[in-house]
Amino acid sequence: MDAIILCAGKGTRLYPITESRPKPMIPIAGKPILEHIIEKIENYVEKIYLVVGFEKEKIIEYFKENPKIEYILQEKQLGTGHAVLTAKNFIKDDFLVLNGDIIFEDSIDEILVYENAVALSKVGHPENFGVVELGYDNKIINLLEKPKKEELPSNLINAGIYKLQNNVFDILENLVPSERGEIELTDALKKLIENGKLHGIELNGYWNDIGHPWDVLSANNRFLNKIISKVSGKIENNVSITGNVIIEEGAVIKPNSVIEGPVIIKSGSIVGPLAYIRPNTVLMENTFVGNSSEIKGSIILENTKIPHLSYVGDSIIGANCNFGCNTITANLRFDDKPVMVNIKGKPVKSVRKLGAIIGDNVKTGIQVSFMPGVKIGSNSLIGANCLIDNDIEQNSFVYKKDELVITKKRN
């Protein structure tokens, strides 16, 4: 049996983090979403076909040492069904299909029992997903895409993990494109349902569809809480380390710093002196958190520098960023209500605590503050003394035009 993982999309709801990387390459607990998926399935399959598109080179480079992986280019993103069809000439038997933006804990053993099966998950807001109605013997009798609340047949949703027979390719080839002009895998599933040939198996463990920035942080928290301590880096004098902490070889923790796990600090990173790294934080390779800076519940991507007197909370900071002194990310509203985030032009409720989502190659001057939930596009410059309370597009230069008045001092 082989597997197909769908990795070609752009992940626009996760901008600006996905402006310069495929969504499956966003790190969760220090490694890409896609690596978590591959680890869950590689013992079941002979070959793993990654259907790639946007920023494909980053996926190919990262997994180049894995002999099971081959790549199929989806030049135009014409739907999930079209993505599966690109693998038709490579698949000779039953196969797995997985969305490249999910993360889960359960084994897939149970779905392998059936000829055609879909993994299901219970969620709190099923109206945002494809919702499934189960009948006798786990047969799926209905699949509704994002139904209204009053039309919900259950709280079980399509979890984006499938085991299918090879003849599904024939169904896909004969589908009529959707209103969006796309070939949808769910339309093929509906054909199987009509013929009584699709089963649903509920996942009992954690599952998350990584659709928004706060989903990244939530999954990161979950998987960080499973780590086992391993300290291989250099720990200097008067450093306090509590909880489960991974400090890779080549990392340096300078004097009088405090680290409270779960935390991962990757190779080449420097922390301190006098830095405070709080729980649920990941510092990717070659990051620098300097004197009197505090990081809490955040993911700091590679080569980013937060040198001094700064606070980053519940945030995702892109690669190659450089924060000026006293850069602050606010992460909580006065009224304790969920932070509102602009997603594709619409305000969306997120979670109670959410800081800033900052793209790659962003630089800030001294005393820059970000209000909760703001997004800063890649390659932007934020000048000194700015309070950022709206999203900033990529390649922007933001500065404050205060007038400085100079007069002669009176005696």
Swiss-Prot record:
Residues reported to bind N-acetyl-alpha-D-glucosamine 1-phosphate: 80, 130, 142, 158
GO MF entry, a single one: UDP-N-acetylglucosamine diphosphorylase activity
Reaction(s) the record says it catalyses: N-acetyl-alpha-D-glucosamine 1-phosphate + UTP + H(+) = UDP-N-acetyl-alpha-D-glucosamine + diphosphate; alpha-D-glucosamine 1-phosphate + acetyl-CoA = N-acetyl-alpha-D-glucosamine 1-phosphate + CoA + H(+)
SUPFAM superfamilies noted in UniProt: Nucleotide-diphospho-sugar transferases, Trimeric LpxA-like enzymes
Positions of the UniProt region annotated as N-acetyltransferase: 225-411
Coiled coil location: none
Location of the active site: 308 (proton acceptor)
GO biological process: UDP-N-acetylglucosamine biosynthetic process
Keywords: Acyltransferase, Multifunctional enzyme, Nucleotidyltransferase, Repeat, Transferase
Superkingdom classification of source: Archaea
UniProt-listed Pfam families: Hexapep (PF00132), NTP_transferase (PF00483)
Pathway listed: Nucleotide-sugar biosynthesis; UDP-N-acetyl-alpha-D-glucosamine biosynthesis; N-acetyl-alpha-D-glucosamine 1-phosphate from alpha-D-glucosamine 6-phosphate (route II): step 2/2; Nucleotide-sugar biosynthesis; UDP-N-acetyl-alpha-D-glucosamine biosynthesis; UDP-N-acetyl-alpha-D-glucosamine from N-acetyl-alpha-D-glucosamine 1-phosphate: step 1/1
UniProt-annotated binding residues for UTP: 6-9, 74, 79
Region (Linker): 205-224
Family: In the N-terminal section; belongs to the N-acetylglucosamine-1-phosphate uridyltransferase family. In the C-terminal section; belongs to the transferase hexapeptide repeat family.
The name this protein goes by in its record: Bifunctional protein GlmU
Taxonomic source organism: Methanococcus maripaludis (strain C7 / ATCC BAA-1331)
